[in-house]
């Protein structure tokens, strides 16, 4: 008994010490978990009397520190999301998801951010591609020298032919666009019959076999025009190319699965550098255009607009929305192509509009500018080939009016 009494105080003391250590370890583990995991409660509201689908919600992650993975739920349903590194510094800057809402609905979402792990994988609903030809590949739509970025010096003799399909291309289920890698930086269009992704299979060069299977193809001849909303300079009388430049870059910022982001970077043009960013969301036929300058450009005027498709009819609300509907050959190869009918549209916020120029034989032009170092606008189009789209100028112009009044002017409201 004496021996037991001798050791008891020591055992008791060691037991207390162990409990303190264990408690400290548990608290440290809890604190570590709390730091590694953050929860955001978000409410997304549809302000309109019509249901809305695939409405973009973008969360700035700057104040949340290191984020490597995210999980979004509404109730028990997991919602696909996407993390993007916008400035390409290997840290995610934005979280994006798409909301489906009934008329006037307010829907709650729970966002959990994780400091470890990797982004969750979801089915791709957009696609982007930048590549050079592989001399060993004979099929025109199976080239596989994929790039993420390419820069040409300003004195590059022929950047247009460096890249396969002549520039970066991207798509949602409803559209497909390529941007020429030259001084025009024009947007050329791919028309679809079915609502799906196709450019990975066709690479903008659809074979006869693919056409027989219902794949789409190039539907617009653009020449030196704006095509669909190319950003240009303005010399006081007419649009000018973004040229000469010190260098010209095309790069893909994000491949999806919910939005793809591509950028055109022009350095050393008229003493400014500019970045033209195109954002394509899944489920959308419209594309967001943001132009960023390296300094305020209040003293500069620029231009954009849409091509005057041969024989086209025009619509304008004279407040930034302009559209056309017309038919023309998309290529001089009349054996493998047919005349294509398209509807085009552009919508520019009124604060950027300096003038709306009268239509000429080539295009419908806006003169634009900004008091700071950023401006933005939206572009949109349809093909008459679509089984899911519009098939007359009246249908298309009515759609454009509704698109502006709802999607453009009344985006969903996000609170968190």
Which stretches of residues belong to each language-model region?
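Alpha-mannosidase-like glycoside hydrolase catalytic domains involved in N-glycan trimming
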Residues: 37-142, 149, 153-158, 165
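A short, structured loop/turn motif at beta-sheet edges
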Residues: 102, 106, 252-258, 282, ...
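Solvent-exposed N-terminal domain segments of exported/luminal and surface proteins
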Residues: 115-241
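Extended, loop-rich substrate-binding clefts of extracytoplasmic carbohydrate-active enzymes
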Residues: 212-283
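Acidic (Asp/Glu-rich), glycine- and aromatic
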Residues: 274, 285-318
